[in-house]
């Protein structure tokens, strides 16, 4: 290559690379402006519709007559039923007060009341008979399904050996007893909100390093001594983006079992090597990264609006954010989701049948984050959004600490004195929240490096979707969100072409470096086999 050619290419590299950097800075500038306007809109939204932040209000103690192990807690309007288990010893008969206490919750304190609300004669007969005929009876928990309250008791050695008392929850917050034959109605929802697809024989690719093709996007195998996940359909190479050892080194491709679920940018994988338990992984196509997460064996739930996947110890977003929390408890099953009235916050509840533990995970669709999970043995939510929960003591006690948090999980939206002609009021809180969430997704994309697959194409698509979906986006009352969005779209469109130029430059530079390195390596090899009488001959040899 001539000196002039080299100089020209270097100048082009600097020019085109500089243009690309200018576009990146422009995107960042418009992103900063979008943040300012979103914050202004959020403040205005809260003034109109009100806002409830998650904060610790107080801690109180529920006091019981006997030493006991707390089991669960349930709110009925402003009343609260507390369930527990007392060591009976030589006591011949179990009374209702040996298992339940009733409290009125006011002023962040619990005030004991009579058990009149559940002193139904038919229920009392069934209750006494249960303790008479089943020696190892223990109260487990409350659950509410379709306006019915279920009191669940364990009556045998297995966790599936249960007796369930069913109550109808009346509109006036009273309870009407139904029966003790409803155990079959108490079951958890589907633990996967997607279907695992098993790979078929026609997905196998034979070769020196055979693998199974997952929709021609991902390639997996358990041969050659390790489990490998690849992103190239290349059976001549055994290298991939992720690998870990398997127990049986000599297994064939047919010996393993492979399952997958297509979740957009994410692909969930369930791979069972020969004579081993299944291993679980999540692949992100945008970042081309793999994370192992064996808690997927227990359950996995979709986040709202296609944001990604949540499980009992973490979550994985479509945009690549992955978070695993320290509290990892195997065997947690998905029980329910609770949605705030404005659609901004989602509470995901996971339950462990053997240990009677709950994990509560609150996800905010605007911030697209899960706050620190709550691990507890019992929880309940009052209509005003006050969440009460407790951790059971290891030893029986008369005093049980209850933490009380204010949360956005109210029964109804906060009531504010607002002008019904207010433009934001006419739009509606949920619509604004959804638009803000989509704008925050754009902001997350702006933080990505250009190694993120199709980054600028995604920015163009996302900004176009927001601009086309919300008629109010260009109004002054919503702070003209369309302006920074249009600028981001314009800059991203330009960046697509410029980034292709930069990629070509980088690839060309990479090839030149590889070529020069190869020549240098050959030259150094020759010098080892050649004798030089003086330094001038050595320098001349290198120059040629």
PLM ranges: what are they?
Residues 2-25, 52, 65-71, 78:
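Long, compositionally biased low-complexity segments enriched in polar/charged residues
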Residues 6-8, 17-20, 24, 31-32, ...:
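Short charge-dense sequence patches
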Residues 21-24, 28, 33-36, 71-93, ...:
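Short beta-strand elements that form the blades of beta-propeller/WD-repeat-like
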Residues 33-63, 92-129, 159-203, 225-251, ...:
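Surface-exposed loop/turn elements that mediate protein-protein interactions on large endomembrane-trafficking
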Residues 66-68, 132-140:
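Signature of short aromatic-glycine-proline-rich micro-motifs recurring in repeat-based ectodomains
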Residues 137-140, 255-256, 375-377:
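Catalytic micro-motifs at enzyme active sites that drive phosphoryl/nucleotidyl and oxygen chemistry
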Residues 340-341, 364, 428, 534:
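Helix N-terminus capping/helix-initiation residues
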Residues 406-544:
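Amphipathic alpha-helical assembly segments used for oligomerization, scaffolding, or translocation
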């Amino acid at each position: 290559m001539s000196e002039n050619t080299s100089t020209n290419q270097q100048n082009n590299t600097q020019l085109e690379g500089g243009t690309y950097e200018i576009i990146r800075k422009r995107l960042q500038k418009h992103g900063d402006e979008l943040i300012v306007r979103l914050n202004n809109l959020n403040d205005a939204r809260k003034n109109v519709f009100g806002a409830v932040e998650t904060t610790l209000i107080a801690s109180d103690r529920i006091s019981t007559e006997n030493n006991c192990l707390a089991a669960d807690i349930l709110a009925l309007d402003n009343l609260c039923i507390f369930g527990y288990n007392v060591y009976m010893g030589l006591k011949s008969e179990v009374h209702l007060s040996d298992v339940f206490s009733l409290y009125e919750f006011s002023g962040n304190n619990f005030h004991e009341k009579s058990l009149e609300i559940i002193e139904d004669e038919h229920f009392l007969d069934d209750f006494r008979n249960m303790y008479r005929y089943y020696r190892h009876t223990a109260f487990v928990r409350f659950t509410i399904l379709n306006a019915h309250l279920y009191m669940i008791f364990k009556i045998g050695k297995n966790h599936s050996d249960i007796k369930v008392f069913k109550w109808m929850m009346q509109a006036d917050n009273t309870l009407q007893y139904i029966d003790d034959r409803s155990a079959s109605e108490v079951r958890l929802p589907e633990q996967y909100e997607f279907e695992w697809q098993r790979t078929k024989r026609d997905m196998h690719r034979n070769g020196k390093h055979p693998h199974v093709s997952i929709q021609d996007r991902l390639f997996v195998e358990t041969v050659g001594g390790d489990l490998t996940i690849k992103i190239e359909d290349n059976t001549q190479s055994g290298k991939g983006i992720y690998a870990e050892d398997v127990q049986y080194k000599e297994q064939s491709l047919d010996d393993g079992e492979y399952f997958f679920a297509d979740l957009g940018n994410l692909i969930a994988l369930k791979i069972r090597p020969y004579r081993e338990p299944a291993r679980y992984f999540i692949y992100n196509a945008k970042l081309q990264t793999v994370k192992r997460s064996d808690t997927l064996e227990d359950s996995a739930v979709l986040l709202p609006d296609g944001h990604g996947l949540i499980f009992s110890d973490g979550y994985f977003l479509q945009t690549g954010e992955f978070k695993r929390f320290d509290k990892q408890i195997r065997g947690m099953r998905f029980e329910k989701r609770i949605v705030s009235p404005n659609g901004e916050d989602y509470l995901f509840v996971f339950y462990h049948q053997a240990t009677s533990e709950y994990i509560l995970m609150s996800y905010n669709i605007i911030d697209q984050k899960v706050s620190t999970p709550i691990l507890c043995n019992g929880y309940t939510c009052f209509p005003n959004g006050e969440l009460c929960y407790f951790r059971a003591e290891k030893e029986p006690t008369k005093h049980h600490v209850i933490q009380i948090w204010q949360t956005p999980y109210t029964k109804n939206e906060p009531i504010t004195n607002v002008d019904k002609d207010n433009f934001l009021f006419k739009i509606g809180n949920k619509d604004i929240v959804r638009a803000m969430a989509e704008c925050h997704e754009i902001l997350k994309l702006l933080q990505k490096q250009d190694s993120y697959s199709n980054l600028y194409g995604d920015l163009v698509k996302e900004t176009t979707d927001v601009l086309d979906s919300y008629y109010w986006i260009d109004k002054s009352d919503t702070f003209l969100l369309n302006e920074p969005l249009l600028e981001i779209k314009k800059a991203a469109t330009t960046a697509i072409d410029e980034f292709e130029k930069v990629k070509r430059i980088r690839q060309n530079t990479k090839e030149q470096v590889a070529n020069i390195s190869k020549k240098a390596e050959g030259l150094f090899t020759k010098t080892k086999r050649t004798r030089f009488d003086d330094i001038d001959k050595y320098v001349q040899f290198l120059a040629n």
